[in-house]
From Swiss-Prot:
The gene is menD. Belongs to the TPP enzyme family. MenD subfamily. One of its GO terms (biological process) is menaquinone biosynthetic process. This is 2-succinyl-5-enolpyruvyl-6-hydroxy-3-cyclohexene-1-carboxylate synthase. GO terms for molecular function: 2-succinyl-5-enolpyruvyl-6-hydroxy-3-cyclohexene-1-carboxylic-acid synthase activity; magnesium ion binding; manganese ion binding; thiamine pyrophosphate binding. Homodimer. InterPro entries: DHS-like_NAD/FAD-binding_dom (IPR029035), MenaQ_synth_MenD (IPR004433), MenD_middle (IPR032264), THDP-binding (IPR029061), Thiamin_PyroP_enz_TPP-bd_dom (IPR012001), TPP_enzyme_TPP-bd (IPR011766). Keywords: Magnesium, Manganese, Menaquinone biosynthesis, Metal-binding, Thiamine pyrophosphate, Transferase. Binds 1 thiamine pyrophosphate per subunit. Pathway: Quinol/quinone metabolism; 1,4-dihydroxy-2-naphthoate biosynthesis; 1,4-dihydroxy-2-naphthoate from chorismate: step 2/7; Quinol/quinone metabolism; menaquinone biosynthesis. Its cofactor is Mg(2+); Mn(2+); thiamine diphosphate. It catalyses: isochorismate + 2-oxoglutarate + H(+) = 5-enolpyruvoyl-6-hydroxy-2-succinyl-cyclohex-3-ene-1-carboxylate + CO2. Catalyzes the thiamine diphosphate-dependent decarboxylation of 2-oxoglutarate and the subsequent addition of the resulting succinic semialdehyde-thiamine pyrophosphate anion to isochorismate to yield 2-succinyl-5-enolpyruvyl-6-hydroxy-3-cyclohexene-1-carboxylate (SEPHCHC). The keyword Magnesium applies.
């Protein structure tokens, strides 16, 4: 084949891939510059059905795609060139696999004759993500390979996708056509003649039925299950699962609803949100130990005390509801797992428990803790928990909340306030890394342009400074709240043998501030050390059409000392 025909066919395959992905539900494509992925890049540049996002750092790009997929509930495509560009996606792919977020990696690659021979920027890319992505290896574009094969390969890999797929795309040079004029997928092209019908409509070439394997108990099984003292636990749930239905379910059965930070229900007034603290409250814990059946929605619980409670209790019946088959119980309890959407399961024909309202006293204990937190956190010294509670109480219906790992998400889980409504809440708690948090929040903010707040620690932000580049491109409010306690102060809560080891090998104090970083990326910046200034800056930032930074300066020991003091009060209640 002449070289010009090679470039044209490369581009045509790229266009077929991007068009079919758009028909399969992809709305966003995240792209990093590179030469070997040129057929995909040029095709994406002409694809009007996809919103394009560009970033030079593939690690941040992968996490941005993760955020876009979380917020949209749809697969997101990622285009990279060959070599370590692909490897830099690994952390985001791991997180997406563990949390069932659909990402589609389209990696440009060298042809077979340039692999394993010292050719430039060539590594073994197939299976680079090991067990964390479904692998599809495309051959180099060839006129002897029917275009239908390409489409059916994509359809089989992507339809009903709930986890990452890696599609490795080999291209021979030349990669750049001599001109870019007209439509790439020209219906007059002899190569595309078998796709005339496909070109005339907007449906995928192969249309798969939904592969949902929903399961539900019989009425008799439900009646037996609710006959006793039980609890309902809301773990990690997405907004699409409509977790609000669990409130009505708990009220109908007459069992308490215990809520995790990631349930979308942590602040609901009808839920027992302070469960982490109640499990060290002597009277509350004694009451909870009377339960002999449990209904868990989702998994990946944050509270170690709640995880231990599930592990130590002698359950007569343990039901868990998950949207797809998974193993999300580190205590390995004997249980019945039902595959269903949380809202669907909550709307089954449930009966009133024979022990309805058995744990009503928990409401009193929960309210006592709420009053304690108002007195000792909201009205106490300035600190991280105070800031997090202030954020959670501000315009919850108007914004989205992304909570960073390490100390921020734990403070929210322990001390979030009760409120009439809760912001849609996101986390990265699959692998629970501190990398890519800003990039993920940028993706969440970029999908619909809804005001978004990111609560992030100083080390997490240092880990993802490059993603300020993504943040500055946003045209909707993204408030980046950096809790700067000068190091990894979650280690203050852990039993490191002595303070010298803690300081030298765990906390890693750095003495850095973020004002110059914000200035480098031309982002509005404020540094605060009291609640009044924070609230003033925060309200202003929520109205700013773009990203802005608020750095909260706190001492290394403020949060850990406050946690210890509150724990002592709760244990003595």
């Amino acid at each position: 084949m002449r070289t010009e025909n090679t470039a044209t066919l490369n581009l045509m395959w790229g266009a077929l891939i991007l068009e079919e992905l758009a028909r399969l539900g992809v709305q966003h494509v995240c792209m990093a510059p590179g030469s070997r992925s040129t057929p995909l890049t040029l095709a994406a540049a002409q694809q009007t059905k996809l919103k394009r996002h560009l970033h030079f750092d593939e690690r941040g790009l992968g996490f941005m795609a993760l955020g876009l997929a979380k917020a949209s509930g749809a697969p997101v495509a990622i285009i990279t060139t060959s070599g370590t560009a692909v490897a830099n996606l690994y952390p985001a792919i791991v997180e997406a696999w563990l949390t069932h977020v659909p990402l589609i990696v389209l990696s440009g690659d060298r042809p077979p004759e340039l692999l394993g021979c010292g050719a430039n920027q060539a590594i073994v890319q197939p299976a680079i993500f090991a067990n964390y992505a479904q692998q599809v290896n495309l051959p180099t574009p060839d006129a002897h390979i029917a275009p239908q094969m390409l489409l059916t390969t994509l359809d089989e890999a992507v339809a009903n996708q709930t986890r990452p797929v890696h599609i490795n795309c080999m291209y021979r040079e030349p990669l750049y056509p001599s001109e870019m004029s007209g439509t790439i997928l020209d219906s007059e092209s002899p190569y595309l003649r078998p796709l005339q019908t496909w070109l005339q409509h907007a449906r995928p070439y192969t249309q798969y039925g939904k592969s949902e394997q929903l399961s539900s108990p019989s009425d008799d099984a439900i009646m037996r299950f609710v006959h006793g003292k039980g609890v309902i636990i809301a773990g990690t749930l997405t907004p699409e699962q409509d977790p609000q239905q669990l409130i009505a379910l708990a009220q109908k059965i007459g069992w308490p609803l215990l809520t995790d930070a990631q349930s979308q229900l942590r602040q609901h007034p009808a839920a027992i949100g302070n469960i982490d603290q109640l499990l060290q409250h002597p009277k509350a814990r004694n009451l909870l130990q009377e339960a002999d059946r449990v209904l868990v929605f989702g998994g990946r619980l944050l509270s170690k005390r709640l995880i231990a409670y599930l592990a130590e209790q002698n359950w007569h019946s343990y039901w868990q509801v998950l949207p797809q088959q998974d193993r999300l119980d580190p205590s390995h309890n004997a249980k019945h797992i039902w595959h269903a959407n949380a809202a669907q399961f909550a709307q089954l024909n449930w009966y009133r428990s024979s022990s309805a309202n058995w744990a009503n006293t928990l409401v009193t204990y929960n309210d006592e803790l709420h009053s304690l937190f108002v007195r000792n956190i909201d009205q106490g010294e300035f600190g991280e928990a105070q800031v997090i509670r202030a954020i959670a109480n501000t315009r919850p219906l108007e914004q989205q909340l992304f909570i960073g790992n390490s100390l921020p998400v734990r403070l929210y889980d322990m001390y979030a306030p009760v409120s009439c409504c809760t912001a849609t809440t996101y986390t990265n708690r699959g692998a629970s890394g501190i990398d890519g948090l800003l990039a993920t929040a940028c993706g969440i903010a970029a999908h619909q342009g809804k005001p978004t707040s990111l609560i992030i620690g100083d080390l997490s932000q240092l880990h993802d400074l490059n993603s300020f580049t993504i943040a500055r491109s946003l045209t909707s409010p993204l408030v980046i709240i950096i809790l700067n306690n000068d190091g990894g102060n979650i280690f203050n809560l852990l039993p490191v043998p002595n303070e010298e080891l803690r300081s030298d090998y765990y906390r890693l104090s750095h003495g850095l501030e973020f004002g110059y970083a914000a200035a480098m990326f031309n982002l509005p910046y404020n540094q605060v050390d009291n609640l009044a200034d924070f609230q003033s800056c925060y309200h202003e930032a929520l109205d700013y059409q773009g990203a802005s930074v608020i750095e909260v300066s706190v001492s290394q020991h403020q949060a850990s000392e406050q946690i210890a003091a509150l724990n002592l009060w709760v244990k003595q209640s």
